[in-house]
Swiss-Prot record:
Originating species: Chromobacterium violaceum (strain ATCC 12472 / DSM 30191 / JCM 1249 / CCUG 213 / NBRC 12614 / NCIMB 9131 / NCTC 9757 / MK)
Active site: C117
Ligand binding (phosphoenolpyruvate): K22, N23
Name listed for the protein in its UniProt record: UDP-N-acetylglucosamine 1-carboxyvinyltransferase
Top-level taxonomic group: Bacteria
Amino acid sequence: MDKLKIIGNGPLNGEIRVSGAKNAALPILCAGLLTADTMRFTNVPMLRDIATTQKLLQGMGVRVMTDNVHEMEITASHLDSLVAPYELVKTMRASILVLGPTLARFGEATVSLPGGCAIGSRPVDQHIKGLVAMGAEVSIEHGYVKARAKRLRGARIVMDMVTVGGTENLLMAATLAEGTTILENAAREPEVTDLANCLVAMGAKISGIGTDRLVIEGVDKLHGAEYAVMPDRIEAGTFLVAGAMTRGHVVLKNAAPKSMEAVLDKLRETGALIECGDDWISLDMKQRPKAVNFRTLPYPAFPTDMQAQLMTLNCVADGAGVVTETIFENRFMHVPELNRMGANIEVEGNTAIVKGVDKLSGATVMATDLRASASLVIAGLVAEGETIVDRIYHLDRGYEYIEKKLGAVGALIERVS
């Protein structure tokens, strides 16, 4: 099993190209199920979760071509199977996103209840509630969601909670429904907006994009299109935190600064000098970062997927910071590992109190989920001595060539078996 070996060695300096967004690419690839035509996607990150999605779609009978790196062509002219099996869904929660488009276009779908991260229950009840409101018959049998509908019909659906996956599934399903669907309390995340823009490129009629009220007029069919996946705001944020922690100067290319203003604001609060253009971000940190308080909330507030990384910055910051996690339970699994490296973090319920220390010490640590593993990598960049991060298969789900990208800006980091 691969590990990362890191030796702390001072500031990061240089340019990093940000990859396409995993959390946008996954639903956008599933949107290919909505048309018999060929979809061509660019800026697709080469990640474990993308490979899993490719396997899932191919298993259903979709033709997937990946002739060029970061490009993918999908043709779902017919499906051999309307089932998404447990063997694949258990490894990645986003597999549930085939439910809406498959049901809408083919009249039935069977999808295993999801697995994926160990950071909380993340139920799919809002997905099911919405599909039932649109006329589907839905049952849960032997761990599978089974849905049928001759043709979905438009409905007004009020989400009980903000759910990114639920919004995406219902948005895709509504594009082929009869009549108008209104999604109230819809997620506003940039990745949802990216999916909506892709659907519009395919011929969908959607208004309110970027707001919490999406109005979708169903059409009889969608057509093929070419679409570029948006840059990954979480990968970008991770590299910016690494730059700030190491007191370096990093410039991110192919970035989307407007999608991550809450993160940039917090980094400015730590003392970082940040400049942005349309597709680039520059961070320069001259001194020890200042500790910051922050709370995770749905977009446009601070994202839960950046919680572990900014908490890690607090570990070596001047002062103390209070971190409150409101999105997922059980999302402090990186805390014991950071404390093993010399951090001073106390957890009370969904709040962590982080007191900055002068230095961290290298240690062997274990990744528990995708973003926790990223936090341990950036902790290793500033720790004295050698850090070994184990179980980095979590990291490979969401970061493309992280050791190469960090190595190119001065980090001493390598993948070892």
